[in-house]
């Protein structure tokens, strides 16, 4: 991975701009504040509102840490959040207002793949950086480019990784060893995208790919369609909460094949009827950064999914602004990969002041955040490890760890 050094950045900015920025540095809070924006489903349905509230607090915490560490070139940071209502059209309006009124150095969000996908073209046209904590859609890897630069990033894994894990569960002799399979997927942007990538990755013959509506009261029909070809395995793609009724229907059938569940559906409290099913699970490291953030948000324990990713999204953007010496979206987008990894000095949650000192001394940074190692690729996304797990009477048991190299080396563990 090539990452631009600070010396290269200052050279790219130019001598005149660098001199002007140097004159602003160290004027403790004297300049106008800089803004981090966020687009979150604060009034979204079901558990989305609670998830968004935790994400909002995580971003607030990253901003607080930045201000405690001296801000960006001596300028305070403020966080301005807008409610997307989990609706792409509402999100587009709120994005336009946020970008025009606040000129944020970065916008954390959106949360949902469908909402993020709807904004990528406009963000690229505006040269406005979006950093999503939870958009896993594979298409985001190539979206949001303008004039040779990428303006859409994420701190969560690409679902192409999850597809590779689910395909391994279906195909591998250690697990389902299936010659034939069907896919049963939730009919939304996330489910359809993951189903498409999984279909391409499967070695087993795909007999059917069946959509279902999230929260459906009549799960029998889709399950009938998925089981009708008598597959050796069913790959089930769903979302927490809205898919549980369909899983219950599936596992309640007299079906002798194996079931592979997508990530975040199974837990230690899943019903005994789910036992035997396999699941793909992101390998979440509990690092110093993880523990620090959980302490900072201790009244919200347990944290909603992707809360750590939301902190990392804001923290990376703020570090990139400090590193580049230029708190504009274009400069921050260009420096994001540089501060996320490499051979620099390791920093973590709450280390913004130390990071600023290192930057001032001409040192490189390597951010190991609330989610652990966040090394971003040229697509501005991390490659993380996954676990293959199985539900048993004893709970969820890990069968295999697939390290990040499994995905970068073409599937060789």
From Swiss-Prot:
Signal peptide start and end residues: 1-31
Superkingdom of this protein's organism: Archaea
InterPro entries (alphabetical): BCAA_transport, Leu-bd, Peripla_BP_I, TAT_signal
Cited function: Mediates chemotaxis towards five attractant amino acids (leucine, isoleucine, valine, methionine and cysteine). May function as a receptor that binds the amino acids and transduces a signal to BasT. Has probably no additional role in transport.
Primary location: membrane
Lineage: Archaea, Methanobacteriati, Methanobacteriota, Stenosarchaea group, Halobacteria
Protein location: Cell membrane
UniProt protein name: Chemotactic signal transduction system substrate-binding protein BasB
SUPFAM superfamilies: Periplasmic binding protein-like I
Phenotype upon gene inactivation: Mutants completely lose the chemotactic response towards leucine, isoleucine, valine, methionine and cysteine, but they still respond to arginine.
Gene name, Swiss-Prot/TrEMBL: basB
